[in-house]
A protein has these predicted regions:
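Short coil/linker segments at helix-helix boundaries
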Residues: 1-46, 53-95, 102-146, 150-157, ...
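Residue-level recognition of tetratricopeptide repeat
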Residues: 47, 96, 147-148, 182, ...
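Amphipathic alpha-helical segments of tetratricopeptide repeats
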Residues: 84, 91, 135, 141-142, ...
Length: 311
């Protein structure tokens, strides 16, 4: 969730590289979808479903270009093609609600690109604004036949970006009710509650997920308990739930399954937490423990800096 709501999510580059095999498989299936749509359209050029899925495939290519390849020109080239086709479909049949998903996403993205890139969007013909995008996405989320769930998921993320937490929370709870085995929706509820300032409720939700991971409930067993506890402790610490956070950091440290980086970072965070709790001598011991591990993301420098200030 935190990645999706970041201001630069649609344009910022990451260090992640898609494995070549997965990339080839994705593009192969996308091409297969386009080929099947074209076969149907050769027989009946007015087949609405074939028109929709062909245009939607270009929308997926656009999403792939901007999120994986970070190729803005390629994203707008495919996005414009999808947008134009689906806008025409909507004009002919306004109640073809699935088409509003791609249209809405495109409009929202165009409306949110940084000002210094807007000239490029204008030159290559991209048009759209944030509010139109949200309006069209809501239509798809309420009335779509094929993409209602996907549209609701997109709306949830974008409502969080817009700080419309009550609406985002309503969707997250609805999706969690329909897909109770998805740990993602349960975590989304906790994260939205945290961002909305409802810290006690957020904490309780994180604990609920922890119990399901601990009990190895279906699908929740895909999360490793020690890694989840570390992330949970960081969340709890950020909310000021210091006792609960301390307990989880110590469990990560004591867990033989925890990787060394998690242990080192737990000692570092625990030192910071103990300083907040006015227990400097214990904090010093935690910072010293950090130095017994390898240096992970500057952990040694951070620990030495705090030790210098505490002595």
């Amino acid at each position: 969730m935190n990645r999706f709501i970041a201001p630069a999510y649609f344009t910022g580059k990451t260090g992640h590289v898609m494995p070549p095999g997965e990339r080839a498989a994705f593009l192969r299936q996308l091409q297969k979808s386009q080929d099947l749509s074209r076969v149907i359209l050769q027989k009946n050029r007015n087949d609405l479903d074939a028109r929709y899925f062909l245009a939607a495939s270009y929308g997926l290519r656009a999403s792939f270009a901007i999120t994986i390849d970070h190729n803005l020109r390629e994203a707008f080239r495919n996005g414009n093609r999808a947008y134009a086709s689906l806008k025409k479909l909507i004009e002919e049949k306004p109640d073809y609600y699935d088409a509003y998903l791609t249209v809405g996403v495109y409009e929202y993205i165009v409306g949110n690109i940084p000002w210094y890139l807007k000239w490029m969007a204008y030159v290559i013909g991209a048009r759209g604004n944030r509010q139109d995008g949200l309006t069209h996405l809501k239509l798809a989320s309420e009335n779509g036949q094929y993409v209602r769930n996907e549209a609701q998921l997109v709306c949830m993320v974008l409502y969080v970006r817009e700080r419309r937490f009550a609406e985002a929370l309503e969707i997250a709870r609805s999706l969690n009710g329909r897909f109770p085995r998805s740990f993602l929706f349960a975590l989304n509820i906790a994260q939205i509650l945290r961002m909305a300032g409802q810290k006690d409720q957020a904490s309780a939700m994180f604990v609920q997920v922890e119990k399901k991971v601990e009990n190895k409930e279906p699908n929740f067993d895909r999360l490793t308990l020690h890694s989840y506890r570390f992330d949970m402790a960081v969340e709890l610490m950020s909310m000021g739930q210091l006792d609960a956070a301390e307990d989880r950091f110590r469990k990560v440290i004591d867990d033989p399954q925890s990787i060394r980086e998690e242990k080192a970072q737990s000692h570092l965070r625990l030192g910071q937490l103990l300083e907040w709790k006015h227990r400097p001598e214990e904090a010093v011991r935690e910072y010293q423990n950090v130095l017994s591990f390898e240096d992970f993301e500057g952990s040694h420098a951070k620990a030495r800096d705090r030790l210098k200030k505490l002595r």
